[in-house]
Amino acid sequence: MVVEEDSRLINLQHKYNPTMPEVVEELKRIWDISFPVAAMSILNYLKNMTSVVCMGRLGSLELAGGALAIGFTNITGYSVLSGLATGMEPLCGQAIGSKNPSLASLTLKRTIFLLLLASLPISLLWLNLAPLMLMLRQQHDITRVASLYCSFSLPDLLANSFLHPLRIYLRCKGTTWPLMWCTLVSVLLHLPITAFFTFYISLGVPGVAVSSFLTNFISLSLLLCYIYLENNNNDKTTSKSLCLDTPLMLYGSRDSGENDVWSTLVKFAVPSCIAVCLEWWWYEFMTVLAGYLPEPKVALAAAAIVIQTTSLMYTIPTALSAAVSTRVSNELGAGRPEKAKTAATVAVGAAVAVSVFGLVGTTVGREAWGKVFTADKVVLELTAAVIPVIGACELANCPQTISCGILRGSARPGIGAKINFYAFYVVGAPVAVVLAFVWGLGFMGLCYGLLGAQLACAISILTVVYNTDWNKESLKAHDLVGKNVISPNVDQIIVKCEEGLH
């Protein structure tokens, strides 16, 4: 029987239930990948907080202009690069699982090239921030500061175009501890570098932008050194982990299949980018709406605290999502659908546990947490009221974030993009507007809109994951990256059916 007919045989596979030792072993593997990634995310969070604090030390104008620039660069640049880079996860992870390192290396290099191409229009947009903001009637002095920050941040696009793919490549190999150590060293150097450029040589806000680039450049340099040393060590024992000396091969021959990598990479990168941007932009949308509420200063201050809170809480779900994406893609590439299902099940269970801790933590610490950011009593009262709602959002956000990782690992990012659009803009946005402005709930209404979006997203995406046919996904992975392996269980079924036909 041919491969096209394999899908008819999948239902013959017996139901697989993992044993407790298998669950514990999978939990250890997910922990080993996710812990360094979570630590790296927290370190980057501290790096960003350091930059904001330094801008605050410069003055209120610099803080306002810097905040505007950071929001603009996140929306138009960093979210796009991050989203495009995640498109390499299914290709790279499944290629590594199927023992196809040349495809993984080629995917890495082409993703870097794709991000460099995307940086060109982003750079033009950043250079034209001033006329755009003035057209939107933003204050001239704030626009001037924001424009300076964006101009000096242009080199950071180059650094991120290499950093994002390299991090994903190493994570797909399960090599996450070097990522954490490289990030730790660069973040420890970030404070003295920022102090030197911002205050010692009096560059001001441009100094903050330059410092962020230098910190990322240091992290990139350390990662490249690690890869170089690892390749030298592997040269003496096994094959290289990354073929740095192979050409980029932007276009392959007609029969080589190299061009298929380009089309497949773009097919995954675009919906991955859309999925990331749709969720990322919703928080900016909520901030904009807060500015139109009856007490905009209070609402905007509370919105800033909420965004900082969600950013911090998001580190653990993001790490779990990255870990399960790696595990699912590796196991599907290796032709082990039952192991991929186990990884997905264990990760969702861990997500539920983490979300409960998030809800308890925000509820218990809702009053103390606000005091970290402000002493304004009105802002503190509003923050204490909405933080438990944000904690309730985490009950849905954590499982849906992990489920997005499962979809990425099984090469289905398009489904996540569609669900994010439906949940955040068809459900969440209208609910937020009606509750905040029509029913008069104010900023609390916006937070309830976020809760509605997260619930809709979680229910939809968990339904998709629950109904996943893992044997079918394994066959798809074989068609995508594998010429070496196929699911042994399905292969046995095919042989038995062929014998029956004779």
Curated annotation (Swiss-Prot):
GO terms for MF: antiporter activity; xenobiotic transmembrane transporter activity
Work out whether the entry's keyword set contains Membrane. yes
User: Which InterPro entries does the record associate with it?
Assistant: MATE_euk (IPR045069), MATE_fam (IPR002528)
Main subcellular localization, coarse class? membrane
Q: Which residues cross the membrane?
A: 30-50, 61-81, 112-132, 145-165, 185-205, 207-227, 261-283, 298-318, 344-364, 378-398, 419-439, 447-467
Q: How does it sit in the membrane?
A: Multi-pass membrane protein
What is a single Pfam family found in this protein's UniProt entry?
MatE
Top-level division of the source organism's lineage: Eukaryota
Protein keywords: Membrane, Transmembrane, Transmembrane helix, Transport
Query: Biological process GO annotation list?
Result: xenobiotic detoxification by transmembrane export across the plasma membrane
User: Which is one Gene Ontology cellular component term of this protein?
Assistant: membrane
| Protein family according to the UniProt entry | Belongs to the multi antimicrobial extrusion (MATE) (TC 2.A.66.1) family.
Q: What is this protein called?
A: Protein DETOXIFICATION 55
Query: What species is given as this protein's source?
Result: Arabidopsis thaliana (Mouse-ear cress)
